[in-house]
Amino acid sequence: MIYKNVEFSAIVTKRKNYRERDMLVTMFTDKYGFKTFFVRGVRKRGFKLGAAILPFTHGTYIGSINSEGLSFITATKGIDQFQSINQDIILNAYATYILELVKAAFEDSIDVTNTLWFEKVLKALSLINDGFDAQIIANIIEVQLLGKFGVQPNWRSCVICGETQSQFDYSESYGGILCRKHWYMDKNRLNLDQRTMYYLRKFSIVDLNYLNSIKVNADTKKKLKLTLNEIYDNQVGIYVKARSFIDKMTKVENNLLKKD
């Protein structure tokens, strides 16, 4: 099915050359999920949509959406670009990671929650672009996206007794947190410190629209990263390309800190 002359909001995620003068541009749209657009004549003099199809550009687009094949853009109505993300390799990597994770969760499906997730991702990228800690914003998305992968940990209360005020640890076997008196039930629980647990629980409910500031020390950031990597590896079972780059950059940074 083709939806002609529709207006939609979108974020440009990537593009690649196609033939001599054309491009294939992938966008995350608010209504149609991730779609690939065929853009003709990109290299022709006077091409008017050049700025609109740069990576990490977002705005309102008009075009035809094909439910199965390539879609098409005919015009735009106001666009903006995440310049800091484009200019910083680390910010770029985390923004790409967020988009790749969301794409893995949604693919080309039209989901009733797609618009909500589009707005959430747009806000996440805006925060990263404005100077918020890119890893922490990505961690928040990781935690909140787990449900879309069929993994819905209970972060609110102990999965055994419902306790909400205690020391907690995360259990992959039980699919959520265990209070201290039930730690004995899972010898393979993650043995997380309470500061890491606090942030994981907080991340599961935080609304990015009301996030004014967030500061997490380096040690806790490292533990959050390792914990979420383990959950995604063991329970979700996906590994997106951008994470590999982030892991390498983190390793280089840690080695430099050791030398200092």
UniProtKB/Swiss-Prot annotation:
SUPFAM superfamilies: ArfGap/RecO-like zinc finger (SSF57863), Nucleic acid-binding proteins (SSF50249). Keywords: DNA damage, DNA recombination, DNA repair. InterPro entries: ARFGAP/RecO (IPR037278), DNA_rep/recomb_RecO_N (IPR022572), NA-bd_OB-fold (IPR012340), RecO (IPR003717), RecO_C (IPR042242). Gene3D superfamilies: Nucleic acid-binding proteins, Recombination protein O, C-terminal domain. It comes from the Bacteria. Belongs to the RecO family. This is DNA repair protein RecO. The gene is recO.
